[in-house]
Amino acid sequence: MDPIDLLRDVAKSFSTNEEIASTERVSVDITRLSLFREAKLAEARDKLQDQIRQRDLCQESVAGDSTTSERTQHVHELEREKMRLARAINDLEETLNATQAATSKLNAELELVEKESQQPIESAVENDSSAALQLKLFRTLGVTFDAEKPEKYTKCMIRSNTTSNVATLDLNVKEYSGFFITNYIWDKL
C-alpha cells in the first residue's frame, strides 16, 4: 500500500470535530457567564446607587436631628452595605476579566487546532522520513518509546484506549524477535 494512501486513511480516522465542538461549547458558556455577570454587576451598581441615595437622605435628616441614634445606626448599616456591594462589584469584575482571558486562550487553542487539521498530508510525507512517520503513527496509537541513548530505544510503553492500562516492554531482551514485539504491542492495544 502506498504510504500516502495509508496516511490519508489514518488521517481520516482522526477527527478534531469533537475538540472544536467542545471548545465552541465552552466559548458559548463563557459568553453566557460573562453576560450573566455583567447583569449582576449592573444590578449591584444599581443597588449601590440606591444605598448611596438612602444614605445621603439619612445623613441630611440626621444633620437636622443629631440626637437620634437609630438614624446613625441606619447610616452605619448603609455604609457597611455599600462596602459589601463595592467588594462584590470588584469580585465580579475580577471574575469577568479571568473569564475573558480564558475565552481568549480557548480561541487561540481553537485556531491552532483548526490550523493543524488543515495541514496537508502530502507535505508531511515529503518533509518527514519514514522512521519519523512511523514514530508519529505509533504515538497516535498510544505507543511511546523511551531511550537511554538517543540512537537506541530501550523500553516501549503501550497505552490501551479500551482498558486505560499502560503496559511496558523491555526492548533490551535479546530473546524477543521483531515478530514477538509486534504481536505484543498489537495485543496490548
UniProtKB/Swiss-Prot annotation:
Keywords: Cell cycle, Cell division, Centromere, Chromosome, Coiled coil, Kinetochore, Mitosis, Nucleus. Pfam families: Spc24. Residues 36-119 form a coiled coil. SUPFAM superfamilies: Kinetochore globular domain. Transmembrane segments: none annotated. Acts as a component of the essential kinetochore-associated NDC80 complex, which is required for chromosome segregation and spindle checkpoint activity. Belongs to the SPC24 family. Component of the NDC80 complex, which consists of NDC80, NUF2, SPC24 and SPC25. This is Probable kinetochore protein SPC24. It comes from Yarrowia lipolytica (strain CLIB 122 / E 150) (Yeast).
